């Protein structure tokens, strides 16, 4: 960091602290309590009328300071919350009095003292000693308004977390959502596993991968675009129920709903089909909502989302008929469907195949109507290369997407376990990929096909978008709000302090 950006007054105070033989950045301090524990202890003492003056040690960042002659008040914050510290010069040793003069907002301090309440009833610690733990050399964002620049909030998330209680709560909620999902999966007998992030083949989804080169092996690897194929290998290997919560990487566009790296939970269950998985997802999400919110509803923007089971179920064909007025099977080729969409004044991307055009219709006409949790089922085969066909209509697959707040939050299907059919689907998928890009070599995942050839039982697979799910729990309409460090375009003027 260029020295000219450091606050001059803070630097002077830093030098004064050093001149008194104090290390402004000591290696440790051992608090006896968190702020939340200290407040709870004060309530317990008052309830029991126990007036013993136990000495506590607290630590945190100075967020507010008020000086009144020989008395000072500071609010310090740790990971559990805020605590007011009461300083009276008569109670402090000389070293603490001198140090007090050189403390600023943003500094980390350790304090020792006993609990009390002020005349206004504020829980406080009456300090008898203060220690310097870390001297802040840059000013914090303005106290009352926090950090308002949205892009700066994302680029400098640490300032956002310091300044905005809502941001801190968002990521506490995110952590809890993942923990509750994990507990639910474990209770249902699923084994949590870890599969490779670096893979020799980019499989499991139709998406552009990130490519990296392994120097020692002298070969390229792909960062995974899905968890699917390795998890299904484990079903082949004899684990009946497996899941993974992990990062996925797709070298594609950025939007309020898409980030190049994102978190998925994928699970695979032997001897289940997509209807079983539908019931399972419905139970899981509604249970997580109830565990975290106390009921089955969540506020989202101007509406209330109701996750009470059962959720509505709508076939994709019926949905597109209802909201777009098109039966896509009346237009069975890319050319005929594109012509019909053009006739209806819809923009058509000539690079997209028939399945992608159907997906466009769903995104344009269907998803805007699906606000409450809804299952969209029975996708065309062209859109679902890894899903089983429906026996009663081989043009369709046993697949569903869960839509909520106009966006997909989960995707699942009865897994294709016929190795011959899977090879044919892979080859078709490969042709589609080659049409999307010509700068990368592509190949079929032969090892996965070999695994299928040894036999995989009927299996229901599920993928849940953790980031989008957290958006619902935290009432955010942008994925960047729920990812600690979202991908952003490089900007030269943010490389130095603004």
From Swiss-Prot:
Origin species: Dehalococcoides mccartyi (strain CBDB1)
Keyword match Protein biosynthesis: yes
Positions contributing to Mg(2+) 2 binding: 408
Keyword Ribonucleoprotein attributed: no
Cross-referenced SUPFAM superfamilies: Class II aaRS and biotin synthetases (SSF55681), Nucleic acid-binding proteins (SSF50249)
Enzyme Commission no: 6.1.1.6
GO MF annotation list: ATP binding; lysine-tRNA ligase activity; magnesium ion binding; tRNA binding
Quaternary state and interactors: Homodimer.
Family classification: Belongs to the class-II aminoacyl-tRNA synthetase family.
Location of the protein in the cell: Cytoplasm
Binding site for Mg(2+) 1: 401, 408
Note on how the cofactor is bound: Binds 3 Mg(2+) ions per subunit.
The protein, known as: Lysine--tRNA ligase
Cofactor dependency: Mg(2+)
């Amino acid at each position: 960091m260029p020295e000219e950006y450091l606050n001059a007054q803070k630097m002077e105070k830093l030098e004064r602290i050093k001149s008194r033989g104090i290390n402004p950045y000591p290696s440790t301090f051992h608090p006896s309590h968190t702020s939340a524990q200290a407040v709870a202890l004060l309530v317990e003492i008052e309830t029991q009328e126990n007036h013993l003056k136990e000495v506590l040690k607290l630590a945190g960042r100075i967020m507010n300071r008020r000086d009144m002659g020989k008395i000072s008040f500071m609010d310090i914050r740790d990971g559990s919350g805020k605590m007011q510290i009461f300083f009276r010069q008569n109670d402090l040793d000389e070293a603490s009095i001198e140090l007090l003069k050189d403390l600023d907002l943003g500094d980390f301090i350790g304090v020792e003292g006993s609990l009390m309440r002020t005349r206004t009833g504020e829980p406080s610690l009456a300090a008898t000693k203060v220690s310097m733990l870390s001297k802040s050399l840059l000013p914090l964002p303005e106290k009352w308004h926090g950090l308002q620049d949205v892009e700066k909030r994302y680029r400098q998330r640490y300032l956002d977390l310091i300044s905005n209680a809502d941001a801190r709560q968002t990521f506490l909620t995110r952590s809890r959502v993942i923990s509750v999902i994990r507990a639910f999966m474990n209770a249902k007998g699923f084994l949590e596993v870890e599969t490779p992030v670096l893979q020799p083949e980019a499989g499991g989804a139709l998406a552009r991968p990130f490519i990296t080169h392994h120097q020692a092996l002298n070969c390229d690897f792909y960062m995974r675009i899905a968890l699917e194929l390795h998890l299904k290998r484990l079903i082949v290997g004899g684990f009946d129920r497996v899941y993974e919560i992990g990062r996925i990487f797709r070298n594609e566009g950025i939007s309020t709903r898409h980030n190049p790296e994102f978190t998925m939970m994928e699970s695979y269950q032997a001897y289940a089909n997509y209807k079983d998985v539908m019931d399972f997802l419905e139970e899981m999400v509604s249970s997580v909502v109830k565990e975290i919110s106390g009921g089955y509803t969540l506020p989202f923007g101007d509406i209330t989302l109701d996750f009470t089971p059962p959720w509505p179920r709508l076939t994709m064909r019926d949905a597109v008929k209802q909201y777009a007025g098109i039966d896509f099977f009346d237009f069975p080729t890319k050319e005929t469907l594109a012509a019909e969409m053009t006739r209806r004044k819809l923009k058509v991307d000539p690079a997209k195949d028939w399945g992608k055009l159907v997906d466009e219709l769903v995104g344009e006409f269907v998803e805007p109507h699906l606000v409450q949790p809804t299952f969209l089922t029975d996708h065309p085969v062209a859109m679902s290369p890894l899903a089983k066909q429906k026996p009663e209509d081989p043009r369709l697959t046993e697949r569903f997407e869960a839509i909520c707040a106009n966006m997909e939050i989960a995707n699942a299907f009865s897994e294709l376990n016929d190795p011959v059919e899977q090879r044919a689907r892979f080859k078709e998928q490969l042709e589609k990929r080659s049409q999307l890009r010509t700068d990368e070599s592509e190949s079929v995942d032969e090892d996965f096909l070999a695994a299928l050839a040894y036999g995989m039982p009927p299996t229901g697979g599920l993928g849940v978008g953790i980031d989008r799910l957290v958006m619902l729990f935290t009432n955010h309409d942008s994925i960047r709000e729920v990812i600690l460090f979202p991908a952003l375009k490089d900007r030269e003027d943010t490389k130095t302090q603004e």
